[in-house]
C-alpha cells in the first residue's frame, strides 16, 4: 500500500523531541479517524534546550517506530518552526485537539 495524497488525511504537527508512545497513540487515533496521517515535524533543532535532536534524527526515529506496522499509511513532512495555525471560514476540514 502507498500513501495516497488525494485520500482523506489527518494532520499532526509537532517537534517530537523525542517521538514517544504518546505521539504514537495520537497517530493511531488520527489514523482510525482519517485512514492515513501526515506527520508535520517542526524544525526546532537548537532553538531551546528542549530541542536537542536534528530534524533528520527525529524523522528517522518516527520511521523506525511506524514503518513496520503502518507502511503506506503515513507521510512525514519537514516544516519550518511553525508558531501558529490560522484558517479561514468554511475551509473544508475540522480543527480538533
Regions found by a protein language model. Give the residues of each.
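Nucleotidyltransferase catalytic core that binds NTPs
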Residues: 1-97
Amino acid at each position: 500500500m502507498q500513501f495516497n495524497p488525494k485520500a482523506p488525511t489527518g494532520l499532526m504537527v509537532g517537534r517530537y523531541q523525542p517521538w514517544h508512545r504518546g505521539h504514537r497513540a495520537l497517530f493511531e487515533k488520527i489514523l482510525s479517524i482519517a485512514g492515513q496521517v501526515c506527520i508535520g515535524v517542526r524544525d526546532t533543532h537548537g532553538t531551546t534546550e528542549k530541542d536537542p535532536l536534528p530534524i533528520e534524527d527525529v524523522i528517522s526515529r518516527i520511521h523506525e517506530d511506524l514503518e513496520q506496522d503502518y507502511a503506506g499509511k503515513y507521510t512525514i513532512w519537514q516544516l519550518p518552526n511553525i508558531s501558529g495555525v490560522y484558517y479561514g471560514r468554511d475551509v473544508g476540514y475540522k480543527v480538533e485537539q
